[in-house]
Structure formats: C-alpha cells, structure tokens
Amino acid sequence: MAVQQNKKSRSRRDMRRSHDALTTAAVSVDARGETHLRHHVTADGYYRGRKIK
C-alpha cells in the first residue's frame, strides 16, 4: 500500500483542487420562451427553430 513520505501542505492541496469547481449548465431561452440546454433538442422537439421528426 502506498504511503506518502511527507505531508502535503494546505497550499499544495488547495492548488490541486483549484480546477475542481462545478459550473452551471449553459441554458438557452429560445424565441418561444422555452429553456433548453445549448445544442440540444427542446422537450417538444424543436432545434434551431425547426420541428424535428
């Protein structure tokens, strides 16, 4: 089992975690007022203003 030789400082630990922050989802509102994820089909089947089959 691997065991560290020296204790990592709070600074080193926090620098490693600097990229772990969560981001909010990019939500778009189309012309009809419906919200959806960018580059995704809406719940009622529209994409870029057109009805998808």
Swiss-Prot record:
<feature type="compositionally biased region" description="Basic residues">
    <location>
        <begin position="7"/>
        <end position="16"/>
    </location>
</feature>
<keyword id="KW-0687">Ribonucleoprotein</keyword>
<comment type="similarity">
    <text>Belongs to the bacterial ribosomal protein bL32 family.</text>
</comment>
<dbReference type="Pfam" id="PF01783">
    <property type="entry name" value="Ribosomal_L32p"/>
</dbReference>
<protein>
    <recommendedName>
        <fullName>Large ribosomal subunit protein bL32</fullName>
    </recommendedName>
</protein>
<dbReference type="GO" id="GO:0003735">
    <property type="term" value="F:structural constituent of ribosome"/>
</dbReference>
<dbReference type="GO" id="GO:0006412">
    <property type="term" value="P:translation"/>
</dbReference>
<feature type="region of interest" description="Disordered">
    <location>
        <begin position="1"/>
        <end position="27"/>
    </location>
</feature>
<dbReference type="GO" id="GO:0015934">
    <property type="term" value="C:large ribosomal subunit"/>
</dbReference>
<dbReference type="InterPro" id="IPR002677">
    <property type="entry name" value="Ribosomal_bL32"/>
</dbReference>
<keyword id="KW-0689">Ribosomal protein</keyword>
<dbReference type="InterPro" id="IPR044957">
    <property type="entry name" value="Ribosomal_bL32_bact"/>
</dbReference>
<dbReference type="InterPro" id="IPR011332">
    <property type="entry name" value="Ribosomal_zn-bd"/>
</dbReference>
